[in-house]
A protein has these predicted regions:
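Conserved acidic residues
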Residues: 35, 68, 145
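Alpha-helical structural signal in soluble globular domains
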Residues: 25, 29, 48-51, 85, ...
Length: 170
């Protein structure tokens, strides 16, 4: 992608929780112009029009030719199909994690990105979180030997996950 003085025209496909977050952040960036969002849910689409002053597309394929880059925030089972459509349309893409539902689809998306010469990235956004960056420094400097993390989430299906690792056990 060539540097440009004009804002990059971007779109978001899927405006559930993560897609809404992407649209919100993109609408605030001076180097990005949120052209539109695509989602089959008309109610969410109308809310996005009001909130982000952008277009809403019921069919994501109508958004593809209008933008340079797209955030894909649809359910994982649709990542492959939507990702291929965007890459084949010449769009740079950010695909929410995981990249695809299985290894075969992931490899297919990587091959399509390479063939299209488009930029593609998986949305591992936590790596930019200041707390995670500092923790990464601490772990790599071997300043701790035990790490316990708890994830708290309003989403019942993701709540109460517990991960522990004790370096002394290894």
């Amino acid at each position: 992608m060539q540097p440009t003085s004009s804002p990059v025209k971007v779109g978001v496909i899927g405006i559930g929780n993560m897609g809404w977050h992407h649209a919100r952040v993109l609408s605030l960036l001076k180097d990005a112009n949120l052209i539109g969002v695509a989602d089959p849910n008309e109610e969410r689409g109308k809310l996005a029009i009001d909130q982000f002053q952008c277009e809403w597309f019921k069919d994501y394929k109508d958004l593809i030719p209008k933008v340079d880059a797209i955030c894909i925030a649809v359910p994982t089972l649709l990542h492959h199909k939507v990702g291929l459509d965007c890459l084949n349309g010449g769009n740079n893409v950010l695909i929410e994690k995981p990249i695809a539902a299985n290894e075969l689809e992931a490899k297919s998306l990587i091959e399509a990105a390479n063939a299209s010469k488009c930029l593609s990235q998986v949305g591992h956004i936590e790596r930019f979180n200041p707390a995670f960056r500092e923790l990464n420094n601490i772990v790599h400097n071997e300043e701790i030997v035990v790490l316990e993390a708890r994830r708290h989430s309003p989403h019942a299906d993701r709540a109460c996950l517990l991960y522990t690792s004790d370096a002394a056990d290894e």
